[in-house]
Amino acid sequence: MTELPDNTRWQLWIVALGFFMQSLDTTIVNTALPSMAKSLGESPLHMHMVVVSYVLTVAVMLPASGWLADKIGVRNIFFAAIVLFTLGSLFCALSGTLNQLVLARVLQGVGGAMMVPVGRLTVMKIVPRAQYMAAMTFVTLPGQIGPLLGPALGGVLVEYASWHWIFLINIPVGIVGAMATFMLMPNYTIETRRFDLPGFLLLAIGMAVLTLALDGSKSMGISPWTLAGLAAGGAAAILLYLLHAKKNSGALFSLRLFRTPTFSLGLLGSFAGRIGSGMLPFMTPVFLQIGLGFSPFHAGLMMIPMVLGSMGMKRIVVQIVNRFGYRRVLVATTLGLALVSLLFMSVALLGWYYLLPLVLLLQGMVNSARFSSMNTLTLKDLPDTLASSGNSLLSMIMQLSMSIGVTIAGMLLGMFGQQHIGIDSSATHHVFMYTWLCMAVIIALPAIIFARVPNDTQQNMVISRRKRSL
């Protein structure tokens, strides 16, 4: 890093700033949801749409981000990403209704979807290959600090200012980032193949409509017949994409990816697994505030052990997988996460609050080990010609499954609760208890998929893949 020119180091700082903004936003909002609900005159049971709208937009836009950067230029797209994210943040802060907030989060999600992948692409273009790993470590470090800082910062802002400030703090940072990008970032472009617009639209429509159909009756009052039509339309769009990809060699995601057994198993397991685990960061601060009566700041602080556990486990997960193999690790961590989630609810309802940080630390560790193992299993056997496409599809599936997970969590709360539930009451405890039991079952189910991972998917495979990528 010290050997790089000054202008390149400044460019890396710009990318790091984008990573920080995007990662901070993924965790800072969850702590503020109960306060948002009160301010907007909404039931807390409907506030999951604030999270779903952002994550689903990121999932939809991810496949187009790399192509746009290559075609239009990394500086232009990164600049546009920061501007859209900043404008979305401003409109979020100005929102007076839930619908306005959801629309503003969609705009914010368009910017967020392009920020991280285009940032990675920028680093590839401006840094010599020999220093690429050091540069990526530098720019992703703020992205690791964001989730750690987000819950506590969100709690402080909500408790001592208002929820609007979790969005307003993005504005000065975004203005500085956009100006620096425009003045300092080179605008690399390359010759690109034709973008698969029909395939992109089919996938986007399918994902959006299916997610809407999953929760439309609760959050939007859509009739059952309309929901059935939406579900059928979404499924038809996905099937049409499969037919399109089968006949089109330039499809957005080639079906040749699924000829690799570990990719198919890993992708299916990642989709199912992240539906369950995606519920936890959303549900935990909501339960701590509404179910237990914690203040926003206290609830935010309680999320820090989970992030610390996740960061700490990343340092040893390779050794664990190499020692026990993918199948054992994935089955054990999947079932373990379900048990830890039940332990969290039991400890909370028993009033043993002093144990909650320890349980959340354990939850973060188990979840991180499972995430890392799922990601590596999915990509490790892909041929080099398909590695980039497979990674893009995995990233899209990760975001989609998390949006579905939050949607299902909101649906479960609505199913067991009423439109307005009291804070720290016996009835509210029952609502969250039943919701957590269902969540534990959903979290455990992917173990059936991971049990099919072949026995030879074991030692040294993580290390060898990492060496190949270097």
Swiss-Prot record:
A GO MF label: transmembrane transporter activity
Subcellular location: Cell inner membrane
Gene Ontology, cellular component aspect: plasma membrane
UniProt keywords, alphabetically: Cell inner membrane, Cell membrane, Membrane, Transmembrane, Transmembrane helix, Transport
Cytoplasmic side: 33-48, 98-101, 159-164, 218-221, 284-285, 363-395, 452-470
Bilayer disposition of the protein: Multi-pass membrane protein
Family: Belongs to the major facilitator superfamily. TCR/Tet family.
NCBIfam families referenced in this protein's UniProt entry, alphabetically: PRK10504.1
Listed name of the protein: Putative multidrug resistance protein MdtD
Gene symbol of the encoding locus: mdtD
